[in-house]
Design a protein with these regions (language model features):
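Conserved strand-to-loop turn within each blade of WD40 beta-propeller repeats
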Residues: 16-19, 58-61, 93, 99-103, ...
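Loop/turn segments within WD40 beta-propeller blades
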Residues: 5-10, 46-52, 89-95, 113, ...
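WD40-repeat beta-propellers
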Residues: 4, 22-26, 64-68, 88, ...
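A short beta-strand motif characteristic of beta-propeller blades
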Residues: 31-36, 73-78, 115-121, 159-164
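Beta-strand-rich domains and repeat architectures in extracellular enzymes and scaffolds
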Residues: 1-20
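WD40/WD-repeat beta-propeller blade-loop signature
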Residues: 9, 32, 42, 51, ...
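WD40/WD-repeat beta-propeller blade N-cap
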Residues: 1, 37-43, 79-85, 121-128, ...
Length: 184
């Protein structure tokens, strides 16, 4: 297993696998909802896009793939990066998907514009392992990287708002935001 995501409304978990397929499981009944073989490369990242009935997944063949999780039909497939896709984040309200890659970049994709790349964020010096939107400011997101940093960005800006040197000797494998409203 390479990645995992939980559906926001259904009792489902999405699992992305080294074997090149994805599986959706019902964690209440412990039964498989769907299995979709995608490619011969590991699938490292995946997310539900519940408002569209989609899953979006990224793999080691550099492609971003989108499938309808109810029918299993492919919506689209395209080369998103020239290297492995490590992480995916879905914007909470806008038609945006972020991808983080071993090519040292984060890209912002717009599915309402035929999956056009709206922006490429550069500045990391190693593999981008994780991306996450800020639930309290959805114009902002963070990226975590093996260059020991977390960068916080704003959509539409070419440079990060700031960079945190997270570790002296270890890379950053995961970033996330606190989702509840009881803290700033």
């Amino acid at each position: 297993m390479k990645g995992i995501d939980f559906h926001p409304e259904e009792p489902w978990v999405l699992i992305t696998l080294y074997s090149g397929k994805i599986e959706i499981w019902n964690y209440e009944t412990q039964t498989q909802v769907r299995s979709i073989p995608l490619c011969d490369a590991p699938v490292r990242a995946g997310r539900f896009i519940a408002r569209k009935n989609w899953v979006v997944v990224g793999s080691d063949d550099f492609k971003l793939r989108v499938y309808n999780y109810n029918t299993g039909e492919k919506v689209t497939e395209f080369e998103a990066h020239p290297d492995y896709i490590r992480s995916i984040a879905v914007h909470p309200t806008r038609p945006f998907v972020l991808t983080g890659s071993d090519d040292l970049t984060v890209k912002l994709w717009n599915w309402e514009k035929n999956w056009a790349c709206e922006q490429t964020f550069t500045g990391h010096e190693h593999f981008v392992m994780s991306v996450a939107f800020n639930p309290k400011d959805p114009n902002q997101f963070a990226s975590g990287c093996l260059d020991h940093t977390v960068k916080v960005w704003s959509i539409g800006q070419d440079v990060p708002n700031f960079t945190l040197k997270a570790h002296e000797t270890k890379g950053v494998n995961y970033v996330d935001y606190y989702p509840l409203q009881d803290k700033p």
